[in-house]
């Protein structure tokens, strides 16, 4: 503040550095600190998030009057103009470690989002309207890292807001603006993906104008949520010049408005959209699988006839499916087809498959079914011994037994591979959506729970460490976004590799 003395600031710095934690330590620095009573030294941690005054020893309090009032003036009438100071005395190692960790965090966030922006601008394959949303998201997260996080680091280390209240108001508004814009961009991306999945014509109709309109709406809504405290919608008791802390407005009405608009409503929309995307993707994958199976069955019917008047049969023996007391039943399946000019040997009118060996349970094994399939293919091929190019192939044999069981020998390597691929696609879609929604909820849900209940509960019930942790956990989402929304794209991965190895040169893109 403008009325700080050098001794005041030196005292704060000394306490932060662990140089002076007792009155004797202060005297050893040779600094005089007007307005500080030795018996009124603060001993408790500073409640950095909500401006709580510390506890005082010997029953007296220390104060710095903004109008340079006398140090002996401790009357209650001046307490509203006093600024209470209470700094947690950390060791030098603790401060250095905290500074390094948070500094690296901010640096990684800046680098990650700069990579995304550079990739979209430099890589030709990424020059499409769908990536405009990714680009705008990276800009919002970069603003969080550049404009918001550095002051958060300073506040986290010092535990005191040293700047003017006007700077605090602007910083809080920018914080809410950028974080809200980042969250709303995730909703816009989810909507774009949902329309692309459910609407056949959306990809064709998705123009730059449409995407830019979505981006504009995102920033306007974020601005609408962030600026009300600048126009008076705030808690009048939350003055940084009095409390020594800079926090978002604790007005109950604004708290509900901002948390619902910035998180809870977007979260609900995202959850609904991604659940529907997953259902549509799963339905489409299974539908494609069914259509492929149906088409394959049509082309792989058991058909062994060389001319319209000549028929061949495949006999399927069901002895193995019945219990030992059951009667043996044989069923024949006939399916005529044309011979394409071939004449089979008259003596091969009927082709009978040999009975399959049975396992201990009386049911034929899969390996036996495969052997039987090969045997029938050989026999039917021999039926065209006059040199016909068409080779009959039996790819599907079913045995319907008395007990209602159906055994299929359609266990070819091709079908197994296709089933594995379809299952892999479905699992990948579910995993991708789970990562996106899970990261969003893990990062932001704890912060907004505390932010919503904060004005309605006793502030002492929420530890300052918990407030700091959930705040930086929310900031962590700005570091994860450039990873989550690009790592699944081969184009982005290729662009990142080119950037890392300096393959982008002037005139070569």
From Swiss-Prot:
Residues 1-99, 155-169, 234-259, 457-465 are extracellular. The keyword Cell membrane applies. Glycans are attached at residues 3, 47, 58, 68, 72, 78. It comes from the Eukaryota. Disulfide bonds join 168-246. Keywords: Cell membrane, Disulfide bond, G-protein coupled receptor, Glycoprotein, Membrane, Receptor, Transducer, Transmembrane, Transmembrane helix. Residues 123-132, 192-210, 282-432, 489-509 are cytoplasmic. One of its GO terms (cellular component) is plasma membrane. Pfam families: 7tm_1. It is a multi-pass membrane protein. GO terms for biological process: adenylate cyclase-activating adrenergic receptor signaling pathway; positive regulation of MAPK cascade. Signal peptide: none annotated. This is a receptor for 5-hydroxytryptamine (serotonin), a biogenic hormone that function as a neurotransmitter, a hormone, and a mitogen. This is 5-hydroxytryptamine receptor. It comes from Lymnaea stagnalis. The lineage of its organism: Eukaryota, Metazoa, Spiralia, Lophotrochozoa, Mollusca.
């Amino acid at each position: 503040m403008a009325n700080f003395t050098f001794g005041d600031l030196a005292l704060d710095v000394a306490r932060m550095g662990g140089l002076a934690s007792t009155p004797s330590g202060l005297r050893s620095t040779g600094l005089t600190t007007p307005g500080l009573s030795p018996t009124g030294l603060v001993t408790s941690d500073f409640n950095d998030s909500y401006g709580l005054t510390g506890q005082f020893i010997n029953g007296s309090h220390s104060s710095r009057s903004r109008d340079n009032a006398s140090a002996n003036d401790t009357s209650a009438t001046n307490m509203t103009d006093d600024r209470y100071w209470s700094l947690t005395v950390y060791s030098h190692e603790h401060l250095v470690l905290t500074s390094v960790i948070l500094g690296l965090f901010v640096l990684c966030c800046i680098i990650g989002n700069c990579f995304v922006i550079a990739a979209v601008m430099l890589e030709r394959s990424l020059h499409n309207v769908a990536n405009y949303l990714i680009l705008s998201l990276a800009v919002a997260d970069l603003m969080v890292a550049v404009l918001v996080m550095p002051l958060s680091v300073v506040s986290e280390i010092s535990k005191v807001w040293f700047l003017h209240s006007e700077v605090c108001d602007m910083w809080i508004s920018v914080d809410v603006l950028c974080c809200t814009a980042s969250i709303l961009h995730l909703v816009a991306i989810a909507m774009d993906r949902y329309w692309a999945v459910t609407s056949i014509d959306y990809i064709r109709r998705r123009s730059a104008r449409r995407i830019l309109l979505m981006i504009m709406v995102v920033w306007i809504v974020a601005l609408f949520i962030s600026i009300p405290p600048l126009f008076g919608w705030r808690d009048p008791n939350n003055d940084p010049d009095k409390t020594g802390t800079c926090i978002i407005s604790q007005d109950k009405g604004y708290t509900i408005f901002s948390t619902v608009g910035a998180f809870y409503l977007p979260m609900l929309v995202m959850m609904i959209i991604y659940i529907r995307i997953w259902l549509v993707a799963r339905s489409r994958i299974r539908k494609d699988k069914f259509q492929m199976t149906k088409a394959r069955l049509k082309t792989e019917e058991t058909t062994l006839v060389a001319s319209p008047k000549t028929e061949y049969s495949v006999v399927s023996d069901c002895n193995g499916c019945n219990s030992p007391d059951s009667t043996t039943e044989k069923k024949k399946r006939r399916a005529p087809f044309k011979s394409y000019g071939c004449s089979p040997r008259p003596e091969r009118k009927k082709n009978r498959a040999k009975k399959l060996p049975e396992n201990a349970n009386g049911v034929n094994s899969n390996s036996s079914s495969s052997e039987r399939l090969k045997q029938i293919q050989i026999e039917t091929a021999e039926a065209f011994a006059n040199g016909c190019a068409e080779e009959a192939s039996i790819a599907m044999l079913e045995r319907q037994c008395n007990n209602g069981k159906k055994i299929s020998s359609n266990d070819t390597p091709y079908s197994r591979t296709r089933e594995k691929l379809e299952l892999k696609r479905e699992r990948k879609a579910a995993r991708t959506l789970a990562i996106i929604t899970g990261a969003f909820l893990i990062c932001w849900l704890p912060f907004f729970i505390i932010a919503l209940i904060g004005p309605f509960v006793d502030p002492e019930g929420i530890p300052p460490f918990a407030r700091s942790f959930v705040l930086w956990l929310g900031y962590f989402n700005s570091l994860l976004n450039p990873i989550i929304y690009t790592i699944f794209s081969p184009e982005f991965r290729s662009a990142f590799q080119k950037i890392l190895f300096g393959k982008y040169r002037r005139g070569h893109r």
